[in-house]
Amino acid sequence: MTKEKLSPGMQQYLDIKKDYPDAFLLFRMGDFYELFYDDAIKAAQILEISLTSRNKNADNPIPMAGVPYHSAQQYIDVLIDLGYKVAIAEQMEDPKKAVGVVKREVVQVITPGTVVDSTKPDSANNFLVSLDTDGSQFGLSYMDLSTGEFYATTLADLPAVRSEVLNLKTRELVIGFELSENEDQLFRKQMNLLLSFEKTVYDDVHLLDDQLKAIELAAAGKLLQYVHNTQKRELSHLQKLVHYEIKDYLQMAYATKSSLDLLENARSGKKHGSLYWLLDETKTAMGTRLLRTWIDRPLVSSSLISKRQDIIQTFLDHFFERSDLSDSLKGVYDIERLASRVSFGKANPKDLLQLGQTLSQVPVIKTILESFASSSLESLINQIDTLPELEALIRSAIDSNAPITITEGGMIREGFDETLDKYRTVMREGTSWIADIETKERQKSGISTLKIDYNKKDGYYFHVTNSNLSLVPDYFFRKATLKNSERFGTAELAKIEGEMLEAREESANLEYDIFMRIRSQVESYIERLQNLAKSLATVDVLQSLAVVAENNHYVRPSFNHQQEISIENGRHAVVEKVMGSQEYIPNTINFDQKTSIQLITGPNMSGKSTYMRQLALTVIMAQLGSFVAADSADLPIFDAIFTRIGAADDLISGQSTFMVEMMEANHAIKAATPNSLILFDELGRGTATYDGMALAQAIIEYIHNKVGAKTLFATHYHELTDLSTRLTSLVNVHVATLEKDGEVTFLHKIADGPADKSYGIHVAKIAGLPKDLLNRADHILVDLEKMSAAVSVNLKNETKESQPVEEQLSLFAIDNNYEELIKKLKQLDLTNLTPRESMNALFDLKELL
C-alpha cells in the first residue's frame, strides 16, 4: 500500500516511525498500544501475541499487533531484556474532542540503559555509560536514571575502558565519536553491548562542573543529551556530576573480580557463593546497592577505612541497640527510586505513602544512633535529615487506603481540603437523598417493587415491571423500554443526579489537581531525600558488616606501612560459609619486609587456589572496611590486585587459555607496583612443558627483580623451587599431605618448603578412574622412576648429560633420548593437561623416538 492511499492515522504512524527506526514504536490507539509493519511481525514472534492486519480486504493488508495499555509494561520489559529499544507514542488530546486525526507524540524512548519502571524490580544499579575520546585518552561517564547517580572519569586506553565498562555491568553504551573497526568489534561483538550514538553536548551548568577535564565533560554532556532525547523531560533527580579516579580505589580488573567471586559466583552466575552474598545482611534496597559498590571499589585510604571500622566496632559493642536499628531499617523503602519516580512524574499515591512511612522511621533511626553515644557516629548522625515538614504533608494529605492509580479518586485524606470535603458530602448525602426519594415514591405510587437503579447510559432511574405500569404517576417520564419492564425518571431525581454527577466530576478533577500539587511539592525535596538515602544506606551497610562479623567471628584487621602481611589462622570467608557445619582448616599467611614471593607447590585439589583466594578476599574485605575471617590480621594497604586463577578461555574473541594467561600476566607485570598483590595459579600450563616452565621462571624473576609486588605463585613445575637458592625474596611453601598405609590425605594446610611429590595418581583415584588403570599407572611410575637418568636442567640453563651410548637401544634402554623421554613423561601433569597441551606433549615425545 502506498503512502498516498494510507489513512491519516497510518500516515501519522509512518511520520513518527521514521524518527525512531531502531526502536519498536508502540502507537497508542484507544486502550491499546498498536504496532505495525515489521515491528508488528517481530513483536508478535518475540512477545507471543496475535499478528493480525489492518485493512484486511486491501491488496496489501498492514501487519498489526497490539497490547493493552494497562499491561504494556510487562511486554516492554521483555523487549528491553532482549536488548531492544521501545518508543512510546501517546495520544496528546482527548479523542472525543479531536478535530481530524488525534494528535500523537513520542513521550519516552525506553532503552536497556534507561529503564526506570519495570514489572521486575531489582535493587541493583542499571548504569547507562557514555564514552568519548580526544585521541589520546578516553572520557567515561555513567548514570543510573533510577537513582540519579552521575559520575565521570578519565581512562588511559581501550583495555582500561573495557575493564571499567565490564565492571559497571553495562548493557548500553553511548558513543560520542567515530568508532574504528577494532573498537566496533570490541563493543558490539566481544562485549555484546547495545551501542547508541550522540554527538551533541548538553550543557547543564547545574549538573556539570567546569572544573572537570574537558574529555570528561564531553562524555557527560553527550550522555545528558542522550537522556534528554530519550526521556523527553527535565529530570530534577539527576545529581551533580561527580569526578572519580580509578586510583582512589583498590584496582581490580573485571576478570579478577570474576575469578574471586566478588559480586556473583562465576560458575553459576548467581549471588549465592559470592562475597556479596556473604556480606549482605542489609535491610534496605539502598544499602544493598551501596554494599555492592563498596565490594566493587575497596578503599586505599587507611583513615577512611578506619572510620568504617570504628562504626562497625561500635555496633558490635551494642547488641540490643543494633538489633533495634536493624528492625527500624526494615521499614525504610527505596528512597532513591521513589525520588526518581517523582521526578519522572510517575509517582502514585502508594509511592508517596511509602515515602511517608520511611520518613516516619527516620527520627526513630536517628534516636537509636544517638543512643550508641559514640563519637564515631557523630558525622553520620548529623547528615541524617528527618524532613519533618514533608512527612507531615504526606501524612495529612494522602489517604492510607489510597489506590495505586491517580484517576480513581480516594487519594486525598478527609479534612485536607475543604472544597473536596464539600463535594464528598454532596455525594454521600446524594445517596441518602436517592434512598429517601425511592421510599417516598414507592409509598405514593403503591408500587411495592419500585426501586431506583443506576447505569452509565441511563443514569439514575425508577425500575418498573410491566405488571405495574398502570400505577406509574403522571410526573414520571420514560427513559427506556425493555422487554419486561420500563425505566422512568422524575424532575426531582434528575436534579439530585445532576448535583451528584457534578460533585463526582468536580471531586475527581480537584483530587487529581491536589495530588499533582503535592507531588510537585515532594519534588522540591528530591536533593534532600537523596542525601538522606545516602546516609541511611551507609548506616545499613555498616550494620550489615557488624552482623556478619559477629555471626562469623571475624576480627578487625590492622594496617602497616612496612609492606608486611601477617594473617593468623585465616580462612576463605565464602568457602567457610558454604561449608556450614563442616570444619574449615585455617591457614596462616606471613610475608615480612624481605619476602615478596611465595612459590606454592602441592597436588591438585589440595587447596592451593583456595589459599590464594583467601589472601585476596581478606585484603578486599579489610580495605572495604569489613572485619576479616582470621584470628588476627595485619596488612599493608594494597593499590591493586592482579590474578590469573583458573582457565578462563576468552571464547568470544577467540583467544586460547595460554593467550589469555600471557595477556593477563603482561598486564600485571606492567601495571603492578611494590604496593600491589599478584596471584598467579599454574601460569604456563597452556603451552609445551619447557616453554611453560621457562616463561614461569622468567615471570617470577621479573616480578622479583623489577616489580617487587607481593606475589603468590602456585605451580606444578617442581623444578622452580630451586629458585629460592638465588632469589632472596622468594620462599617455598607447599600444601601438606599425610601418607599412611598407601593412602594419601590432603591436609589443606600450608607448610614451609617445597612439595616432594605431585600425587597425580592419587588425584586420579579421587576422580574415580578404574582401579586396574590406577594399578597399571603405579607400576609404570615405579619403572620410570627406576630407569630415570640423571638428566637435569638447572636454573642457569646448564645441562648435565649421561655418557653417550654408541647405538640406539630399545625403548627401555637407558640412552640420552630415553632419559629425556623419561624426564618429560615424569614432568607431565596428566590431571591438568588441556587437549591442546596434550597434543603439544605428544609432538615433543614423538621427536625423541
Curated annotation (Swiss-Prot):
Family membership noted in the UniProt record: Belongs to the DNA mismatch repair MutS family.
Coiled-coil annotated residue ranges, if any: none
Record keywords: ATP-binding, DNA damage, DNA repair, DNA-binding, Nucleotide-binding
Function: This protein is involved in the repair of mismatches in DNA. It is possible that it carries out the mismatch recognition step. This protein has a weak ATPase activity.
Biological process terms in GO annotation: mismatch repair
Signal peptide feature range: none
Pfam families reported in the protein's UniProt record: MutS_I (PF01624), MutS_II (PF05188), MutS_III (PF05192), MutS_IV (PF05190), MutS_V (PF00488)
Top-level taxon: Bacteria
Official protein name in the record: DNA mismatch repair protein MutS
Annotated binding of ATP, by residue: 602-609
